[in-house]
């Protein structure tokens, strides 16, 4: 029986833990060769062991998305080695400070935007030739419901995710006539380290896990997926079209 991602090449950022780790494992289980990128070498090595244990394969890339020079070299290196990139899962991000908007320092504000927005822009620029070399390229960006709610004390994170959504939708429109499909994913509250950091009083056992989300990411990453420029909302279990003013 053919696996849904058989033979596909997938790059996953933030792959050492949480959603990225669960997605990387699920992609490998579905037949993809996973290029796992994260800052944490130990976490990547554990992921590699798990993937190999199920007969999958992975390439580990210990790197920081904030390292612009390293990210600039990544896309050409992927293209040279594999000739294409079928799946980009841009998952890595940071929460930043949870504080009144005007109490956030310029350094903190810039750091959140650099990782959550600018690093993803640089990454997309770097891997675009490899994505477009695929017969069915998929660019998937992890967003958040915070981008739409205007939550008190969440401004840096919320604004950065709103900007990421605008970037992804713009790119989806630019590539609409190509084989590339661009999707956003709102995972909702999941049992992750970032969620525990943001909501320390919450019982994590009441939340779904990254492993619950992963099969949906496999579906979006598959060659059969046809939607572009939309948001898969995991809490609702459906694809949403952003409501744009006329």
Residues of each region from the PLM?
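Conserved glycine-rich Rossmann-like NAD(P)H-binding loop of the short-chain dehydrogenase/reductase
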Residues: 32-46
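Alpha-helical segment proximal to the catalytic Tyr-Lys
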Residues: 129, 172-174
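Conserved glycine-rich cofactor-binding loop
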Residues: 9, 16-18
């Amino acid at each position: 029986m053919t696996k849904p991602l058989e033979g596909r090449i997938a790059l996953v950022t933030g792959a050492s833990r949480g959603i990225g780790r669960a997605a990387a494992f699920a992609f490998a289980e579905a037949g993809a060769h996973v290029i796992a990128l994260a800052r944490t070498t130990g976490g990547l090595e554990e992921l590699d062991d798990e993937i190999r244990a199920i007969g999958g394969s992975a390439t580990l890339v210990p790197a920081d998305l904030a390292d612009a020079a390293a990210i600039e070299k990544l896309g050409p290196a992927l293209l040279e080695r594999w000739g294409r990139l079928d799946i980009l899962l841009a998952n890595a991000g940071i929460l930043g400070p949870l504080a009144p908007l005007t109490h956030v320092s310029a350094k903190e504000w810039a750091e959140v935007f650099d990782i959550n927005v600018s690093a993803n822009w640089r990454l997309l620029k770097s891997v675009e030739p490899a994505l477009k070399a695929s017969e069915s390229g998929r660019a998937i960006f992890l967003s958040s419901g915070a981008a739409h709610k205007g939550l008190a004390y969440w401004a840096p994170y919320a604004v950065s995710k709103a900007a990421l959504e605008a970037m992804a939708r713009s790119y989806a429109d630019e590539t609409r006539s190509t084989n590339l499909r661009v999707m956003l994913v709102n995972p909702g509250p999941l049992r992750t380290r970032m969620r525990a950091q943001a909501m320390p009083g919450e019982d994590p056992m009441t939340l779904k896990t990254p492993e619950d989300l992963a099969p949906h990411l496999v579906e979006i990453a598959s060659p059969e997926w046809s939607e572009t420029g939309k948001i898969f909302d995991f809490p609702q279990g459906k694809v949403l079209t952003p409501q744009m003013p006329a």
